[in-house]
Amino acid sequence: MDLDTITSISTPMGEGAIGIVRLSGPQAVEIADKLYKGKHLLNDVPSHTINYGHIIDPESKEVVEEVMVSVLRAPKTFTREDIIEINCHGGILTINRVLELTMTYGARMAEPGEFTKRAFLNGRIDLSQAEAVMDFIRSKTDRASKVAMNQIEGRLSDLIKKQRQSILEILAQVEVNIDYPEYDDVEDATTEFLLEQSKEIKQEINRLLDTGAQGKIMREGLSTVIVGKPNVGKSSMLNNLIQDNKAIVTEVAGTTRDVLEEYVNVRSVPLRLVDTAGIRETEDIVEKIGVERSRKALSQADLILFVLNNNEALTQEDYTLYEVVKNEDVIVIVNKMDLEQNIDINEVKDMIGDTPLIQTSMLKQEGIDELEIQIRDLFFGGEVQNQDMTYVSNSRHISLLKQARQTIQDAIDAAESGVPMDMVQIDLTRTWEILGEIIGETASDELIDQLFSQFCLGK
């Protein structure tokens, strides 16, 4: 594919030890050679080497920066094009000057995600792998990054390609039946083959969809909201789970005036922990904003940790709060077990019914293990499955797999009902196309542009 040469800063903007300007395209080495004082990059430098030198402004002859230049020649690069990476000091001013020089001498500013888009367009990766690159960058837990890396390595792609190949084999057999309708035994054999293979494809699609709920949690984290009256120990619970001091812990009710959020691994389950301001009536303007944000967080939660105070009897406020959350996935926690017990546990059990109940002391770090195990068991039914298995974690992929399951079922129903093979062929072809959208082989240009526009600059 004949494309122009693009350039961008590939490291976060701001002060740092290193900043990188990346170029990709047919003129990448030539443009860098015009700016670089050192070895002759075009002729004297082999591929996949790092070279010390300086960036010079060709017009003023001024030394702009002391650099290390990586030369990566096509096709063994991320984009399958020539790539230059100019490693500069991390100051904003200097790295921008180097970027401007690359554009002055022939490169174009890259669009968001354009380097990865070129890797896709040049056949280096497919669309699902490209999406996994961004998932990997955005991953907040070890497990999320592992799921993304498995997808980058092509595990999902291989499974999708295998099913598409099976559909092509069915379609080839259907074509034989259409071309030679006079042979009854051919039609019978075709129907039998079609049903057997189609049911296997549907079974594989179902297996992938079965991983969707867990995969989405791995990718995005389980949105977990800690809720309860002010000063029941919500912030202490957040700090114990993340083993950090993120929230202010005091004896003053209403100290948390905003929604605090943190990512953490709990028994291999990635949680997006949200500590809310206590939900109560208040005249304090700042606290009132926090309460409203808490209500919004509750409405979006996957899991709610409802905290009660062992040192206080249940109040109407506790009952009111539980009414708000009782129809969600809830774990009730009676905290501050190190203090005198003034709460009636039997009354708590009457209020919550079969909802899981854990007793803890965040001060003495007691009951935390039981809480973590309960969280894991509630969503994963025990041990989390092997992280090396292939998960479907992307909402777009899940939606397409559901569509493919329906169209392959339509083909099965049609074949079993004796519908003419050329009609069955339509459903099979549609299934093949839908699966192709996952890996980008049948995706529209508009979809591809939209997906890559979500990437960051320089990637």
UniProtKB/Swiss-Prot annotation:
GO cellular component: cytosol
Keywords assigned by UniProt, alphabetized: Cytoplasm, GTP-binding, Hydrolase, Magnesium, Metal-binding, Nucleotide-binding, Potassium, tRNA processing
Enzyme Commission no: 3.6.-.-
Residues binding K(+), per UniProt: 231, 250, 252, 255
Pfam name, any one: MMR_HSR1
Location relative to the cell: Cytoplasm
InterPro entries for the chain: G_TrmE, GTP-bd, GTP-bd_TrmE_N, GTPase_MnmE, MnmE_dom2, MnmE_helical, P-loop_NTPase, Small_GTP-bd
The record's free-text note on cofactor binding: Binds 1 potassium ion per subunit.
Residues binding Mg(2+): 235, 256
SUPFAM superfamilies per record: P-loop containing nucleoside triphosphate hydrolases, TrmE connector domain
Cofactor field: K(+)
Single GO biological process annotation from the record: tRNA wobble uridine modification
Domain TrmE-type G: 221-380
PANTHER family documented for this protein: TRNA MODIFICATION GTPASE GTPBP3 (PTHR42714), TRNA MODIFICATION GTPASE GTPBP3, MITOCHONDRIAL (PTHR42714:SF2)
Role summary: Exhibits a very high intrinsic GTPase hydrolysis rate. Involved in the addition of a carboxymethylaminomethyl (cmnm) group at the wobble position (U34) of certain tRNAs, forming tRNA-cmnm(5)s(2)U34.
Subunit note: Homodimer. Heterotetramer of two MnmE and two MnmG subunits.
Protein name per its UniProtKB record: tRNA modification GTPase MnmE
Organism (species): Staphylococcus aureus (strain Mu3 / ATCC 700698)
Gene it is expressed from: mnmE
